[in-house]
């Protein structure tokens, strides 16, 4: 039930392990920090990371007459979270489902969750272009979707998969809002590229979509995993916070 949701943003990645869920989580927290009511929907069925990243593992969801009720992280209900991880007894339990069952579950997540009034719903997807993504795109035809953000590291292998994501979005009619790159930053001021540099910038220029910023992987940000603390609150002067502010400003301007 997305009738109370004003804006829907999908977060994609061509490969796993590039920081997509971290970007989704911190983007949701940054939007909340900016005064918006936000929902975060984790549909990465085989690798749900959002409950761990927000310290919500072990939370129990329940169903009411109107559908599933998401987990709220605060009494003011400024951040609502839904994930397949809440349905698993153990974080290490695998989800061994065939395509049709995955499709059914994602449709339920997109249509049967009782979201309250939300300014933004961030959808964290699995990596790649699979049945899950096709299901999301089909459901988005029935609900206004603002577009997709693609998360990548700048090495050529990851960028090749990003090109596939871009083609997928174009074929399914999803607007591309921009690319976010992930680097490694061993200290506060000097960013070290362990891959090739400027790959995302050059690709964004080539396909004519915005390059939203480069998020350095700051060890201090990793410490925030397991809590609902935003980088903007805890590390307001960090390079990561500066990039997140820019992304939020870009999204708010578009919506």
Swiss-Prot record:
GO biological process: iron-sulfur cluster assembly
Subcellular localization: Cytoplasm
Keyword Transport: no
GO cellular component: cytosol
Source superkingdom: Eukaryota
Co-factor requirement: [4Fe-4S] cluster
Residues annotated as binding [4Fe-4S] cluster: 185, 188
Family: Belongs to the Mrp/NBP35 ATP-binding proteins family. NUBP2/CFD1 subfamily.
Oligomeric and partner information: Heterotetramer of 2 Nubp1 and 2 Nubp2 chains.
UniProt cross-references to PANTHER family, sorted A to Z: CYTOSOLIC FE-S CLUSTER ASSEMBLY FACTOR NUBP2, NUCLEOTIDE-BINDING PROTEIN NBP35 YEAST -RELATED
UniProt name for this protein: Cytosolic Fe-S cluster assembly factor Nubp2 homolog
Lineage: Eukaryota, Metazoa, Ecdysozoa, Arthropoda, Hexapoda
């Amino acid at each position: 039930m997305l009738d109370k949701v004003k804006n829907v943003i999908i977060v994609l990645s061509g490969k796993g392990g590039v920081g997509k869920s971290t970007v989704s989580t911190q983007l949701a927290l940054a939007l909340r920090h900016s005064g918006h009511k936000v929902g975060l929907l984790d549909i990465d069925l085989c690798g749900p990371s959002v409950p761990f990243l927000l310290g919500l593992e072990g939370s129990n969801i329940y169903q009411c007459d109107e559908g599933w009720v998401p987990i709220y992280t605060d009494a003011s209900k400024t951040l609502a979270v839904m994930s397949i991880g809440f349905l698993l007894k153990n974080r290490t339990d695998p989800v061994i489902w065939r395509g049709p069952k995955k499709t059914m579950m994602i449709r339920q997540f997109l249509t049967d969750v009782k979201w309250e009034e939300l300014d933004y719903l961030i959808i964290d997807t699995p990596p790649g272009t699979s049945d899950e993504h096709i299901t999301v795109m089909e459901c988005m035809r029935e609900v206004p979707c603002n577009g997709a953000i693609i998360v990548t590291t700048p090495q050529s292998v990851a960028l090749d998969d990003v090109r596939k994501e871009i083609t997928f979005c174009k074929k399914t009619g999803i607007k591309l809002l921009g690319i976010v790159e992930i680097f490694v930053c061993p200290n506060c001021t000097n960013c070290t590229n362990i891959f090739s540099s400027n790959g995302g910038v050059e690709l964004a220029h080539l396909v004519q979509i915005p390059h939203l910023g480069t998020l350095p992987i700051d060890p201090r940000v990793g410490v925030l995993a397991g809590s609902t603390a935003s980088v903007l609150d805890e590390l307001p002067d960090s390079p990561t916070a500066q990039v997140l502010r820019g992304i939020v400003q870009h999204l708010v301007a578009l919506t």
